[in-house]
């Protein structure tokens, strides 16, 4: 986190952790600290190790004290620092909170009671705070219930904070989001995690490639996401499939496909899909084999009010025919709620951005689902 102080210098606050020096461990676990550096030009930085500080252990645990976010609190006329923290003596599963420290000079910091403490998660990583319109928004990411970035909203910076029914921007493949605003556009920047061994069947790794969603505010204050105009405008050469015919499936049973060949490694796919009442599922398949069986799927499921990402095969073949992970009807945590009944017509407008192994779907410029 970087902020300009009253001394006309830029102050950077960042996490310090030493995994190898026992001096900075306790009971075999590394301690975490907030470190401080200053600059006059945002290029050359001077570290101030004497200002490094850890958690106030009368309130917080010393092992989770990271991701500082510093801002000027106009209501309190001071600088506040939000942190990913855990309450002292709390349960492992639900002890996480958004910690708070306060300063009047960016040098001396006092630990305060948590800024936000719902007693729901192991920790609240990468806290972020901003105001849009007349609402305040708190952003944080969790990995105990599931890997996802949440948001909360309030009328005042001091809360109370409320959770909308749909409180996320994306799914598993959009983590640790932080936001920034230029003019009237606010973006949420996160990572699409890589997979171990660059394999579909590998576990997600910690870190990956940058991805960004533009944040929009509804009239009721809830947040939606869309692709940025800058990203969409990159794709200048339009290739329209010729002789597209209506595709009809009677009795809502069976499968029928329309094939568009020649998909590029980097491309944007745009389409409007109209579906009938009672449709069980429809969608788009990417990077399919000649039998239209193996590949990746973005599937709309009106009956379940969701959009999911799937792939086939779902696992490396096993000894028995039924070793196909049929009990996982889509890729774990790659599911987005979607209210089909709220559509004025039974139509969805989709944009699918593809770059190498990354696929990002936007629906009606309100919902995003990213996969690798």
Name every feature range the model reports, one short phrase each:
Residues 1-67, 72-126, 131-171, 192-245, ...:
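Beta-rich carbohydrate-recognition and catalytic domains
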Residues 156, 163, 172, 181-189, ...:
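Beta-rich accessory regions
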Residues 70, 176-178:
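Short, surface-exposed beta-strand/loop micro-motifs that present aromatic residues
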